[in-house]
């Protein structure tokens, strides 16, 4: 009996609790060449945008605090002189910071930290 209890205890000790995925917040670095305003997020594949903060001047970093069980998001920002720009399918569970870029031709991309 004691042998079975010890085996059960050893087996249960090796079982880890499942990891909880989700976003707890992240940083945004603006490298678009212009001021960014009106940051908003939506879950990738949906149409409902949620405002998550003001913005940042070129070269500045801002912190976004929010919590969500999902990971894949689209980020929208209004870039001064260039209108709304959207960066799609950002996995916010795997990154601490995103750097937004926009070149002279209007091409946008994001780098992850």
Which sequence ranges carry the predicted segments?
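Intrinsically disordered, low-complexity segments enriched in small/polar residues
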Residues: 18-66, 70, 78-113
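Bacterial N-terminal signal peptides that target proteins for export
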Residues: 1-7
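Bacterial N-terminal signal peptides
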Residues: 8-14
